[in-house]
C-alpha cells in the first residue's frame, strides 16, 4: 500500500460530499455491520458550518482530517479546535480547572466529535477494508497536531468500542461515562410496554397520553418538501424556548434548519 498522508481541512467546503461520505456512509455499510449514521454525513456536518452553528465566534473551529493512500481518500474524521467544553455532553470542566490551577492552559483542545450530538457512532470514518490503517493514521495525526500546536490534549467522544480500543493502543486514555438508553424488550404493542411498568408509572403515562390526545388540535406528520419555512420558524421558536430552560443552550442557528 502507498504511504498514508493526512491533511487538515478548515472547512468541509474543501472536500466533496461524495469523497467524505465514501468513508462516513459507504454503500453496503449496513450489510457489513456498520449502520449508516446521519450525524457524520457531509450534509449534516456541512450544515453546521454553513449555518454558523460552528465556526468563527462559536468556539468550534473545524480542523477535519483527511487520510489518503496515494490519491485515494481512505479515512476522514470530524475534528475541531475547541475554545471551551460546551456542546459536547461530556464534562471535563474539572480537568480544565485542575490544568489551569497547575499553571497550564487547557484551551484550545482538539475534539473529534459530532457537535451537540451525544449519540454513539463512528468518529474515525474509514472506507471498508481500511479500518486499521485509517484509524491508526487519524489517531497519529491528532497527536501530532496537538504536539505541534502546543495544545493541551486531544479527545474523541461518543466513539465506538473498537475505536476506543484503537485509541488506547495509540496512547489515548480510555474514559467511561454513563448514559441512559431505552431498550425495546420485544414489546408487542404499547399496552405490552405499559404492563412492564409499576402501577404508579402506568397511571402517569396514561394520564400524559390522554392530555396529549385531547389538547384541542390535530397532529400532522410532515416530511421533505411538505415542511415549509413557516413550519421551521415555528419549530425554531419551540427550540429556543426548550433550550432556554434548565440552563440549556440552543446551539443551532435558525439557518441550520433551512
Model-identified regions with their sequence ranges:
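Short glycine-enriched loop/turn motifs at secondary-structure junctions
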Residues: 4, 118-119
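Short, charged/polar micro-motifs that form catalytic or ligand-binding hotspots
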Residues: 10, 114, 132
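Conserved acetyl-CoA-binding loop-helix of GNAT-fold acetyltransferases
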Residues: 106, 131-144
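Short glycine/proline-enriched loop/turn "hinge" motifs that connect secondary-structure elements
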Residues: 106-118
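A short, internal acetyl-CoA/4′-phosphopantetheine-binding micro-motif in the GNAT/acyltransferase core
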Residues: 119-131
Amino acid at each position: 500500500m502507498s504511504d498514508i498522508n493526512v491533511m487538515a481541512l478548515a472547512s468541509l467546503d474543501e472536500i466533496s460530499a461524495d469523497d467524505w461520505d465514501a468513508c462516513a456512509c459507504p454503500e453496503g455499510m449496513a450489510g457489513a455491520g456498520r449502520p449508516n449514521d446521519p450525524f457524520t454525513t457531509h450534509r449534516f456536518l456541512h450544515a453546521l458550518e454553513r449555518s454558523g452553528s460552528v465556526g468563527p465566534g462559536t468556539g468550534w473551529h473545524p480542523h477535519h482530517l483527511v487520510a489518503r493512500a496515494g490519491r485515494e481518500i481512505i479515512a476522514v474524521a470530524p475534528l475541531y479546535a475547541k475554545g471551551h467544553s460546551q456542546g459536547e455532553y461530556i464534562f471535563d470542566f474539572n480537568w480544565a480547572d485542575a490544568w489551569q490551577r497547575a499553571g497550564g492552559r487547557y484551551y484550545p483542545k482538539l475534539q473529534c466529535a459530532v457537535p451537540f450530538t451525544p449519540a454513539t457512532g463512528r468518529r474515525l470514518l474509514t472506507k471498508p477494508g481500511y479500518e486499521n490503517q485509517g484509524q491508526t493514521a487519524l489517531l497519529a495525526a491528532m497527536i501530532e497536531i496537538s504536539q505541534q500546536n502546543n495544545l493541551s490534549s486531544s479527545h474523541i467522544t461518543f466513539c465506538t468500542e473498537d475505536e476506543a480500543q484503537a485509541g488506547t493502543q495509540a496512547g489515548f486514555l480510555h474514559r467511561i461515562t454513563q448514559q441512559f438508553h431505552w431498550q425495546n424488550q420485544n414489546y408487542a404493542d404499547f399496552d405490552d410496554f405499559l404492563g412492564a411498568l409499576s402501577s404508579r408509572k402506568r397511571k402517569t403515562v396514561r394520564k400524559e397520553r390522554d392530555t396529549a390526545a385531547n389538547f384541542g388540535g390535530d397532529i400532522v406528520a410532515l416530511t421533505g418538501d411538505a415542511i415549509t419555512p413557516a413550519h421551521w420558524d415555528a419549530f425554531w421558536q419551540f427550540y429556543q424556548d426548550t433550550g432556554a430552560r434548565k440552563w440549556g443552550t440552543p446551539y443551532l442557528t435558525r439557518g441550520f434548519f433551512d
